[in-house]
Structure formats: structure tokens, C-alpha cells
Amino acid sequence: MEDKRKRRAATLSTALILFVACCVYTLYIFKFDNPRLSPPVSLLPTISTLKKIEHVTDLNKEYVFVGDVHGNYDEFIELIDDKIGGLGENITMILLGDFIHKGPDSDKVVSYILNHKDQVKCVLGNHEILVMMAYLNPDFSKWVRRPKLMTPLTFSTETNFIPQDISKISNAHGRLARELGFSKLSQLAEHCSMAIELDLDITGDILFGAHAGMVPGDFMKPNQIPGVSSLSNMKYVDKKNWSKTSREKENKNYVRWYTLWDKYGDHFSNAKVFYGHDASMGLNLRRQTKGLDTACIKNNLLSSMKVKYDIKKGQYDYELIQVQCS
């Protein structure tokens, strides 16, 4: 009888040990194979899809839209100090995304933005988004085939955003994410947006800034809110269905998005869109769309456009200002 009790106790002990071992193994697998169960120390704040500067009535106010800086801090400061004459109280600068990554001094560019929040506004480009994703998902290379398991970014109009092609997240994005850290990335998430709108009450003009651009009617027609992917990564749009946008030309129906403004812009004649992103097209100044990515990172030019009211003309003037990059 005593031997039977001992054998039963031994069997129960063995079963308990196996059960505990299975639990530990399961937790190990979930912890290291599911990023949702092992998020970074702190998640980033919700990012605004659109921020507005409303009711601009000050005739002395000037706005400077700046193309892709890509971490070229020296040229950025040359633009501010030498070409613009410094950021006085009457000047607001708007960076059109991709102000970090590739160049040598992304951290300095970010610090400048955060130290001059009242005068320097920013929209996020595809590279800022990729750096933020790299921060949220330090082991990003593991999830290329399972992107839905990644920790997403949160925007005011999209609560679970994951880029369509996460294979674009590189080791360089990961290094920059670690360099900037939570403090600076969270401040950028709060300070920047995906698009910015200026309402110039004096003339009734509306100016938009978005890294990749916008199609006619975005943010102007009820319920026409562009997606984060479009605002950050678009180059083409399906001319038969404007909600379909892409970075590459998918088929013969896809056209450069700004050609829609050339054709249909009269329906929104008081609107202009400033953008970067498309260095292959270079400086691309059209009636209602202003492309300012001139490949500073490739030793070309850093381009910007100053918007200033001319009292004599009774309208806003648009002045191109550029710096040679090296």
C-alpha cells in the first residue's frame, strides 16, 4: 500500500513538472516570437493626421516650406541663417518630411526642431515613419513575413498603422531609432503631423503641406481623408479611383498624382500643395503643386519656398530659396 502511494506521488510530481515545463516553454515562445507581448518600454503618442494654422491675418507673417533635408544639418542651418536671415517671430518654417535618415546629422536636425517648436513645424515622411516603426519593433527583420504581428503606429485617423512594405525598414533606421530614443521620437510624434493646413484669411487661399502630396479634394471635401500611406509614400494614383495610390506605377491607369491637380484643380482653385518625396522629378513647380525635393542628400540642392504677402499687389508671393549641398 505504501509503495502504491509513493508511485502515485511520483507520477503526480512528474506530471506537475511536465506541466510547468510546458507553461514555461509556451511563455518563452510567446515572449520572443510575438512582439505584441513584449513591446518597447513606452509606446509613442498618437500622431495627428492633420494640423491646422487657422485664420492667418497678420500681413507680416511669412511661411517657408522646406524640401527633404535628410539629416544634412549644415545645409539646413545655412538655409535658415544665411538665406532666410534667421527665424524671427514673424517666420514659420514647415519641414515637408524626410528631414532625418541618410545624412550625417539627423540627431542635430531633430534637436533643432524640438528646440524651436513655435517656429518650426513638420510633417512626417516615409523615413520618419520607418524609424518610428524600428523603435517600436527592435526585431523588425523577424516580422517581414508576418507584419500584422508588429506593434503599429497610431494616428488620429488610423489606429493600427503598419507600412505596406516593412522590408523597407533597414538597419540604418534601427540605429537611428536607438540614437534618437523614446524622448525625441515621442516629441516628434506629438509635434509633427502627416499634413499641415494654412488658412490665409486675407486672400482666402489654403496651403497644404504633405510629404508625398495630396489629390484634389483631400481634407477639403467631406469624408475625403487621405490615408497615412498616401500622405507619406504616394507617387501615383489610379485616375479612375483616386483612393488607390502607390509608390510605383501599378498599371496604365496610374498617373502622377499632381497631374490630377493640373486637370481638376480649378474645382479647388484657392488651394496649393507643397510636398517633397519625389527627388527623381526634382524641382517641380506647377500652378497648384510645388515639389521641393531636389536631392540634397546627393549633393544637389536643398530647396525651399517662402510665402509672403505683398501689400502693393494684394496677394501672396512665392519665392524659391535654395542652398547648394555638399
From Swiss-Prot:
Pfam families per UniProt: Metallophos
Compartments reported by the entry = Vacuole membrane
Q: Name one GO molecular function term.
A: endopolyphosphatase activity
Q: Bound how, and how many: what does the cofactor note say?
A: The yeast vacuole plays an important role in Zn(2+) storing and sequestering. Therefore, the changes in Zn(2+) concentration may regulate the enzyme's activity.
Q: Which residues lie on this side of the membrane: Cytoplasmic?
A: 1-9
Q: Glycans attached where?
A: 90, 241
Q: How is its activity regulated?
A: Not sensitive to heparin inhibition.
State the reactions this protein catalyses: [phosphate](n+1) + n H2O = (n+1) phosphate + n H(+)
So which stretches are on the Vacuolar side? Answer: 31-326
From its record, what is one biological process in GO terms? cellular response to phosphate starvation
Assembly and interaction partners: Interacts with PPN1.
Role description:
Catalyzes the hydrolysis of inorganic polyphosphate (polyP) chains of many hundreds of phosphate residues into shorter lengths. Exclusively shows endopolyphosphatase activity, cleaving inside the polyP chain. Together with PPN1, responsible for a substantial fraction of polyphosphatase activity that is necessary to mobilize polyP stores in response to phosphate scarcity.
User: What protein is this chain from?
Assistant: Zinc-dependent endopolyphosphatase
Q: Which organism is it from?
A: Saccharomyces cerevisiae (strain ATCC 204508 / S288c)
What does the organism's lineage look like at the top? Answer: Eukaryota, Fungi, Dikarya, Ascomycota, Saccharomycotina
